[in-house]
Amino acid sequence: MQLDKQTENNIQITFRNIIEKTCFIDKLRSITGVIKDRFSEHDPRDTDKITYPCEYLFVVILFAGMAGYKTKDDVWHFWDSNSALLNEVFPDLQGNIPSTATITRAQRMLESDVLGGELKSIMSRQYDLVRVSRKIYATEVLSRRDVLACDGQAMRATDRLQPDGSRSGGKQITSIVSYETGMTLGQAIHNKKNQEKKDIIELSKDLDISNTIMTWDAINTHSELVEFVISKHADVFASIKSNQKLTFDEIKEAYESYKKGASPYTKTGHNATATDTVMSGSNHYTRRIVTLRAEDCLSPDVLKKWPHIKTIAVIETASMNMTTGKVTNSVRYYITTLEMDFEKYPDFARDLLAISLKRWCVEVNHWHLDMFFDQDKAAYDDDDAAFCSTIVSKFTMSVFNFAKRAYAAEENRYKGACTTPRLLRACSDISFSALLLESFFNDDARHLTHDRLSRNKKFMKEEERGHWTDMETYDHEPWPLQKFIEQHRKRKKQEAA
């Protein structure tokens, strides 16, 4: 669904006002205005009988989602816990709180094309602004160019038994995540995994991905997708496996010849190498990359299929478990449209090694969504419900990624103090959510880091899995809400048993 020009201008002006205002109540009212402009036309209810306008309901559903609360009961408790603040934002409600049935109807009004289209539009504009402000939009420095990682994720709880006795595999969500900004720039949902390639193209059509480097798994490595990315003035760094058998076999053969010292692979300017080491938990990783010119490795027929591929990259990884001493070796193969130009890219091999790590940002995002937003456990049969729930979670993760990176960059801060579970719990207080959004849309975390994170002990005390103690210095007390919801869920389980 396309925005008309007037609505688009109104949204941009309103979000600018959110940034400039200092009172978070004014910010919330501005956000409510944005939602009213966009969603009121989709409200099917009788206007004469509406007590709770859709914009009021949607803004609370959005902020509740930022705190990880999705069910109608959770949203109601979130509203009740923040009623003092929301009464100031919505004075015409006179302190009334909608029933869970009203909240359910509001959630069903959020169709995927409406909510998804609007959030994608907002994130797309924000992404362009951030790239320009950080001076990475047109940079020629390879290490500073943004990496857009594309991947699909299965919602396993939606896996269903089919009439023929097979399993459906569950709904598949394809998303694009920016490494430099941490933003999710769009998502699509389907019932089959083989839709990923089409989804990547559809999601990227309306995005300005120029001067970025797009990456994806081997299952999506097809010449049509490479052609599309080139047409958008971007580059490709893609994994390749035996699904592209002829290309894969020629690359493997060329790499074996390189290791034996064969020509032309070993000539000056025809290869580049780099090595790095990484410590992660109890594992020690040693990674070595070899880059070769595509014209040296591939036959004319294969080059005709991949006319834009300039370089082949092979990464060998040796992983040692420091506890057991066991070493595991692996080899991965990549193709890229980036040319091995040592004048333009003096540290070409090391830059590609870094890109191969940056592409995992989408996997990290998926892990957080499963662990802290229960995306993998969401058993939605309806596509709209599944889409709306997950797109709010991805929007939240975009904001959280901004906060975590900003806080990690601060000097003399407690390591790991700003984590997803801590931010989720802090967002139980809607004023903190408003502060996060202000910082995110302004791409300026000074108020966030210096005012709230450093002043409150809630980010400094944690028990296992994010449960905090010593909350005496926190001005707004969100913890009774969390405890109440946990008790409510436990009671419902006991009643069901």
For each of these PLM feature ranges, what is it?
Residues 343-380:
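Short amphipathic alpha-helical "interface-anchor" segments enriched in bulky aromatics
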Residues 384, 388-410:
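C-terminal structured domain segments
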Residues 60, 75, 99, 147-154, ...:
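Short, conserved catalytic/metal-binding motifs centered on acidic residues
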Residues 241-242, 246-352, 356-357:
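An anionic, glycine-rich sequence signature occurring as long contiguous blocks
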Residues 126-233, 241:
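Polybasic low-complexity intrinsically disordered regions
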Residues 1-149, 177-179, 183-187, 401-497:
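Dynamic "connector" segments at or just before major functional cores
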Residues 46-56, 165, 324-326, 379-389:
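Structural motif
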Residues 39, 231, 327-335, 368-376:
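Short acidic (Asp/Glu) and glycine-rich catalytic loops that position anionic groups and cofactors
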